[in-house]
Structure formats: C-alpha cells, structure tokens
C-alpha cells in the first residue's frame, strides 16, 4: 500500500515522515528547488533536524502520484482547486479516496476545501484530517490527536487504519462541514490573539477573546448547516485546535499577529508574511470569512476586525478596541 501526499510544506512533509514507518509514501512538490533539496539532504528546511526516511519517494511530476491507494492533499487552500484540476487531468481513478489536510476558505468562491474537491473531482470520496497538530511535533513523532471526518463510515474506518500510528489518537466524525469551519476560522482567531498578546493586555482579555471565537465558529456553522454539533465544537477539531493555535508562538498565525501588534501601525503585511517559512493561512481566510459572513448576513466581529486591519488599514488601536469590546 502506498499513500501519496501532495504538498511538501511543513505539514505535508511532517505527515510523510509520520506515515513512513508503516508504509511507502510518495511526497509530491511542484517546487524544483524543494525536490532537489529533499532528495539531496533527506531533510526539509521547514523541519530542520527531522530526517525524511528513504521510504519516502519525492516526486516532481504529479502524474507519478495518482496510482496510490490514498491521496492526502496538504497544499494551501488557495492552491487546492488547481491541484485537483491537475489530478483530474491525469486521470485520477474514482476509487481513490482523497484526504484533505488543508485549512481555509477559497477566496474567489467562498467554498470549503471539500466543496472544491466535490466540484473538480465529483467521483472521488473525500475525508478531512484536522485537529491540534504542530508540524514539527508530528515530524518528531510526539503524541497528538486528530479527527478524521468522512460521511462514509466504512471508508472512514479504512482510512483511520491507514493513518493510525502509536503516537496518534484518531477520532471519527461524519461532520465534514463543521470540522472544516473550525479548522479555517481558528487561524483568523490566532492572528487576533497574537495582537492581544503583543500588547500585554493580560490573560483575562486573551481568554475572553478565545471564548468569543467559539461563538463565531458556531455562528458560521449554524448559517452553513442549520445545526452545530456539540461534539465537533468541544472536540479536537475545534476547541483543541483553537486552544493550541491561539496560545502558542509556534503557531504561524499567532506569531504573525504578534509581529503586527508589535509594530505600532508601521507594519508591512507582505514583508511579515514573507519572513515566514510556511503559509499563514489566516491572512487569506480573514478575507474569505468576512465576505462569507456578509453573504450569509451574520455577525463575526473578530473576523471583521482582523479583516479590516489587514485589508483596509484600520489602526491597531482601533482593532484592539473592536477585539476586546
């Protein structure tokens, strides 16, 4: 059995390292420099010190990944549609399941990752792999828990058996939409928390902001589905991921917010983004979430405050006022 992982960023590479003890793995990258570097050093510059096993075969041509038993996609959400189209054009077989390990909302369509796949690859079943998991800790094989969300219970059981490792606790869910909403929004909330932390506004403000974040998840969740599953909200995919991402500077999104808050309105968003080794999904998701809230006619004040700071040049002082009030 072979699993193909599309995307050799920190997260995709960490998954490849984690799974390579149990089975053969193909790791696909569209970046020639990354391809050559990993093949030469058996290490990623995004996960220094974590060796990539020889059982991980790194490929540059996407046509070499389509014959795996399962495909995991770990590319940025804004690139997902293009990658799915490439898989379609390569003749991906309909019996190959796709596991999505990307978090966000497509800016141009306001669609979740599973909705994108359903449009481009309608014959392939989709599952979501999400939860509190820093890539570096996964690559070091430290313990963690995740949710595997899939509407087909039999397929879900099969995929869990493929992904199961000694250091991971996997929970099954049928709530594909809820899990994705949580996964996307928590990155925006982490940016907000980074700003609050940078200004040393205290644990009380930080805790209040994190708590209010769950209310915004619930608001979008209800608007999209008409129902908010309490098990999803209180499980690893929502509460667990939110707590981790909104409290640790190991979070790219929280670190991004912290740098902005420390800059006293003199920040250059693109420069801060370019300083990171990996994609800061919350930047794109802030815009998508704001536009989706407008479309659905719901209030999401934290997402709105982050959006207006990043895209409309609202001051940090006014942003903080909106966040704490």
State where each predicted segment sits.
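Internal alpha-helical scaffold of NAD(P)-dependent oxidoreductase catalytic cores
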Residues: 79, 90, 116-124, 143-232
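NAD(P)-dependent Rossmann-like dehydrogenase/reductase catalytic/cofactor-binding core
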Residues: 186, 193-197, 222-325
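Conserved active-site and cofactor/substrate-binding residues in soluble primary-metabolism enzymes
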Residues: 6, 10, 14, 33, ...
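NAD(P)+-binding Rossmann beta1-loop-alpha1 motif at the extreme N-terminus of oxidoreductases
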Residues: 1-60, 86
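Hydrophobic anchor at the start of a short beta-strand
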Residues: 3, 24-25, 124-126, 170
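Rossmann-like NAD(P)(H) cofactor-binding subdomain of soluble oxidoreductases
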Residues: 51-143, 159-161
